[in-house]
């Protein structure tokens, strides 16, 4: 019976394929990919919805987007009278169409919608929610995922992604909508009057906030290469740099045009060195010093540096975080009660740097919304000078409540330009940080363990650390084990336990005098990540042995 219903369901979807907006994507998929769309459902989680295009409730299409929008409309109307919302969208396939569908559904429920006529960055959406004082915001993007993906992120009135409680409530409203093929969305002129043009003044205000933050970029002979990886950071980043009288940059022209197919990049992820391939070619031709890339929705940023001999140094997210924190400490020396915020899997290096400079630090769960929650709870006398995640997400000033590569681009250029005046580089500055607080190094191992056996393996690893906490790992004495699922810390050196004041998450962190390792399974994929952050000899060898010991 169940198989018959599934077949009927598939036939109904195929009958509506011409109206789905995704027929072309569906026809290009394998039989397995097509079947997955009918055998699963998209779920609205803490980061919204992200998935492939295709037919069925497990894929993004006109009907599943209408279901999402209708659920969100009911959620917003239940929260407040006369809600308002701003929608932004990136350059991906169907981002514009999805934005219009969502706007129409929300307008149909008397929700005022601010909708731009062109693509925007994620940090601009966060800023716009705060600037326009709207009830919520929606960003249509799938960050650096492949070209056949898209997604919807929902933001609250503070410009941060919805809290866990709010996203769970919104999810219930979405699920109550039922079958997406049964939704009827009447459109009338009266309803479309709720859709308003997005004010240009908001973009101007965003630019002014960054200009005020930067002040000026000192004149040096620093040369920069920039790539948007076909994403949204062009034209806003070049316009911003020019407004700061910095013109010593070259764009990777082929990659600085919006392209939903990401035609000229092997990877649209600034964490991946391959994302810099064309930037390196241009840097070698133009003798550039600094290479910068942003991901497609411009919330994350990667950098590399070219020396006089043409050697390229790539900086990981923790190293960029350390450099930016170091610079922000220098810039804010006149402030008291300074605070830095980072995720629990980010480096010991930045914590050591903060301690050395008498800067308070706080650690939060992974996900920038947790950083935003800390910012929201700041006392009046506290000054947040920097926040970051090791996954290349940074924030210098909190007029935005999400990762913001747009504000970081001119900041890192200003830093590099100042260093160039003294004949120094970012690599030199990082080495100085190591000499000051110690050579804390970091690496990440990501394991995909498919199938039932893979799931059991992941559960077994986490259970082992919980029930049989190791006394030492590769000669490193364990001080404590933090379990964010039980909200407990077991202090092995004292044989005591204490509580963690944090939302629950399936993460275990093992602490040593030399640093930590952390284990974090994915909640949606058959993956588990091992983070290693240590100050020790032969770091690479030690990290590899720890990885082999856990996953052998």
From Swiss-Prot:
Transmembrane regions listed in the UniProt entry: none
Annotated cofactor note: Binds 1 Mg(2+) ion per subunit.
Electron transport among keywords: no
Reactions catalysed, as given in the entry: alpha-D-glucose 1-phosphate = alpha-D-glucose 6-phosphate
EC number(s) stated in the UniProt entry for this protein: 5.4.2.2
Coiled-coil stretches: none
Amino-acid positions noted as binding Mg(2+) in the UniProt annotation, renumbered to this chain: 143, 295, 297, 299
Gene Ontology MF terms in the entry: magnesium ion binding; phosphoglucomutase activity; phosphopentomutase activity
Keywords: Carbohydrate metabolism, Glucose metabolism, Isomerase, Magnesium, Metal-binding, Phosphoprotein
Active-site residues, as the UniProt record annotates them: 143
CDD domains linked: PGM2
GO annotation terms (biological process): enterobacterial common antigen biosynthetic process; glucose metabolic process; purine ribonucleoside salvage
Pathway: Glycolipid metabolism; diglucosyl-diacylglycerol biosynthesis
The protein's required cofactors: Mg(2+)
InterPro entries cross-referenced by the UniProt entry: A-D-PHexomutase_a/b/a-I (IPR005844), A-D-PHexomutase_a/b/a-I/II/III (IPR016055), A-D-PHexomutase_a/b/a-II (IPR005845), A-D-PHexomutase_a/b/a-III (IPR005846), A-D-PHexomutase_C (IPR005843), A-D-PHexomutase_C_sf (IPR036900), A-D-PHexomutase_CS (IPR016066), Alpha-D-phosphohexomutase_SF (IPR005841)
Family, similarity comment: Belongs to the phosphohexose mutase family.
Known function: Catalyzes the interconversion between glucose-6-phosphate and alpha-glucose-1-phosphate. This is the first step in the biosynthesis of diglucosyl-diacylglycerol (Glc2-DAG), i.e. the predominant glycolipid found in the S.aureus membrane, which is also used as a membrane anchor for lipoteichoic acid (LTA).
PANTHER family from the UniProt entry: PHOSPHOGLUCOMUTASE 2B-RELATED, PHOSPHOMANNOMUTASE 45A
Name under which the protein is recorded: Phosphoglucomutase
Originating species: Staphylococcus aureus (strain MSSA476)
Organism placement in taxonomy: Bacteria, Bacillati, Bacillota, Bacilli, Bacillales
């Amino acid at each position: 019976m169940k198989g018959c219903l599934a077949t009927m369901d598939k036939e109904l979807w195929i009958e509506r394929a011409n109206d789905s907006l995704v027929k072309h994507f569906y026809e290009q998929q394998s039989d397995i990919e097509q079947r997955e769309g009918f055998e699963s459902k998209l779920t609205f989680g803490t980061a919204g919805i992200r998935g492939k295009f295709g037919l069925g409730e497990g894929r993004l299409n006109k009907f599943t987007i209408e279901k999402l929008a209708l659920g969100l409309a009911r959620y917003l109307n239940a929260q407040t009278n006369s809600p308002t919302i701003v929608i932004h969208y990136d350059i991906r396939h169907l981002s514009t169409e999805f934005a219009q569908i969502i706007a129409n559904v929300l307008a149909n429920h008397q929700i005022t919608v601010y909708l731009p006529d062109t693509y925007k960055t994620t940090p601009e959406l966060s800023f716009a929610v705060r600037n326009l004082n709207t009830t919520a915001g929606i960003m249509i993007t799938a960050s650096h995922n492949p070209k056949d993906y898209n997604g919807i992120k929902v933001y609250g009135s503070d410009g941060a992604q919805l809290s866990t409680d709010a996203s769970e409530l919104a999810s219930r409203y979405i699920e109550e909508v039922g079958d997406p093929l049964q939704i009827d969305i009447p459109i009338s002129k009266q309803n479309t009057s709720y859709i308003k043009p997005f004010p240009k003044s908001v973009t101007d205000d965003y630019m002014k906030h960054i200009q005020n933050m930067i002040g000026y970029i000192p004149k040096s002979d620093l040369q920069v290469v920039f790539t948007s990886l076909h994403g949204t950071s062009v034209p806003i980043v070049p316009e911003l740099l020019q407004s700061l009288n910095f013109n010593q940059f070259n764009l990777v022209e082929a990659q600085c045009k919006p392209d939903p197919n990401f035609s000229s990049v092997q990877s649209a992820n600034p964490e991946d060195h391959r994302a810099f391939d064309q930037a390196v070619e241009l840097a070698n031709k133009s003798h550039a010093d600094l290479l910068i890339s942003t991901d497609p929705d411009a919330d994350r940023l990667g950098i590399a540096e070219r020396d006089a001999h043409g050697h390229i140094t790539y900086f990981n997210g923790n190293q960029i975080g350390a450099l930016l924190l170091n610079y922000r400490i220098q810039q804010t020396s006149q402030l008291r009660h300074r605070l830095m915020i980072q995720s629990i899997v980010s480096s010991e290096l930045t914590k050591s740097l903060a301690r050395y400079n008498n800067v308070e630090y706080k650690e939060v769960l992974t996900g920038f919304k947790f950083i935003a929650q800390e910012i929201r709870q700041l006392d009046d006398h506290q000054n947040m000078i920097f926040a970051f995640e090791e996954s290349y997400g940074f924030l210098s000033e909190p007029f935005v409540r999400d990762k913001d590569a747009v504000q970081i681009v001119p900041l890192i250029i200003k830093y590099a330009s100042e260093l160039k005046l003294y004949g120094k580089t970012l690599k030199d500055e990082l080495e100085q940080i190591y000499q000051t607080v110690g050579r804390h190094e970091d690496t990440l191992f990501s394991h995909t363990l498919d199938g039932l056996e893979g799931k059991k393996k992941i559960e077994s690893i986490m259970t082992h650390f919980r029930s049989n906490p190791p006394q030492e790992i590769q000669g490193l004495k364990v001080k404590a084990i933090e379990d964010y699922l039980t909200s407990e810390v077991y202090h092995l050196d004292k044989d005591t336990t204490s509580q963690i004041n944090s939302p629950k998450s399936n993460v275990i962190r093992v602490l040593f005098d030399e640093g930590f390792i952390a284990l974090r399974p994915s909640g949606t994929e058959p993956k588990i990540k091992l983070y290693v952050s240590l100050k020790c000899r032969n770091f690479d060898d030690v990290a590899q042995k720890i990885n082999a010991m856990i996953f052998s």
